[in-house]
């Protein structure tokens, strides 16, 4: 009697760090990250446009969802930046939250395998360090914009207080705080997608589903943490080092 066994799945088939490179002049970019980012942005814009196309006094359907999302983002900005200063920063905080939230969920829900690429494969934009570092750099820029818009060039006096010796440390602190957020987001999302990929290879039926549900929850939490702390840094810049009363 002949017994034949199918070969076990090869974990070596999982590719990490394999990219589709686009050459734009003198620059080389990760093409699959841009494609995935465009998909995330398109999804967000589609929902927002459809939800606000015909506004009703009594919201329903997508309008209700969009208004709830707006109120949620406003509550984050108000709590971290303060009642007096939060409104101009709602678009930025909301954009951060929605982009990270949708990107994280896309990593678990979107059928990336259905979109073949010449090299590499599509995945969540936030599992690439370039995306998360770019978001951190953007938050750092907004941090300085907030401080300068509030107090002008006198904002930079805080870097030599209480003594000029602390100048390098104070400058480094303002860049490392959002940068630490980028590494946390990148590490969590990359680990989640690798775990799901391994489970799908080993047990491809129902066992990965509860894990995917858990990762949907943690993806939402990561978006909340990044946007909340970004708003907190902006609030700190508006009130100065030491926190002040920006949450009152």
Swiss-Prot record:
* Places the protein is found: Cellular thylakoid membrane
Transmembrane helix among keywords = yes
Q: Which domain of life is it from?
A: Bacteria
Provide this UniProt record's keywords sorted from A to Z. ATP synthesis, CF(0), Hydrogen ion transport, Ion transport, Membrane, Thylakoid, Transmembrane, Transmembrane helix, Transport
Residues passing through the membrane, by range: 31-51, 90-110, 129-149, 195-215, 216-236
- Kindly give the membrane topology term recorded for this protein: Multi-pass membrane protein
CDD domains in alphabetical order: ATP-synt_Fo_a_6 (cd00310)
Gene Ontology molecular function terms on file: proton-transporting ATP synthase activity, rotational mechanism
Q: Where is the major localization of this protein?
A: membrane
Q: Which family does it belong to?
A: Belongs to the ATPase A chain family.
Q: What does this protein do?
A: Key component of the proton channel; it plays a direct role in the translocation of protons across the membrane.
- What PANTHER family would the database entry show? ATP SYNTHASE SUBUNIT A, CHLOROPLASTIC
Assembly and interaction partners:
F-type ATPases have 2 components, CF(1) - the catalytic core - and CF(0) - the membrane proton channel. CF(1) has five subunits: alpha(3), beta(3), gamma(1), delta(1), epsilon(1). CF(0) has four main subunits: a, b, b' and c.
Q: What is this protein called?
A: ATP synthase subunit a
């Amino acid at each position: 009697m002949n017994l034949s066994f199918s070969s076990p799945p090869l974990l070596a088939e999982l590719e990490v760090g394999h990219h589709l490179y686009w050459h734009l002049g003198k620059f080389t970019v990760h093409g699959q990250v841009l494609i995935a980012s465009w998909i995330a942005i398109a999804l967000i814009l589609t929902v927002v446009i459809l939800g606000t196309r015909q506004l009703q006094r009594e919201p329903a359907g997508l309008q209700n969802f969009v208004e709830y999302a707006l109120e949620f983002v406003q509550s984050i900005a108000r709590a971290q930046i303060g009642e007096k200063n939060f409104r101009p920063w709602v678009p930025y905080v909301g954009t951060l939250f929605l982009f990270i939230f949708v990107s994280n969920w896309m990593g678990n829900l979107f059928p990336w395998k259905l979109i073949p690429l010449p090299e590499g494969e599509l995945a969540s934009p936030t599992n690439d360090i370039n995306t998360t570092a770019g978001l951190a750099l953007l938050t750092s820029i907004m941090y300085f914009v907030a401080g300068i818009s509030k107090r002008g060039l006198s904002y930079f006096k805080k870097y030599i207080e209480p003594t000029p010796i602390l100048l390098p440390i104070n400058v480094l602190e303002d860049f490392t705080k959002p940068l630490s957020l980028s590494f946390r987001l990148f590490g969590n999302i990359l680990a989640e997608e690798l775990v799901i990929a391994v489970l799908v290879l080993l047990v491809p039926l129902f066992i990965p589903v509860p894990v995917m549900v858990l990762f949907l929850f943690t993806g939402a939490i990561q978006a909340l943490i990044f946007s909340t702390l970004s708003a907190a840094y902006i609030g700190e810049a508006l009130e100065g080092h030491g926190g002040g009363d920006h949450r009152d």
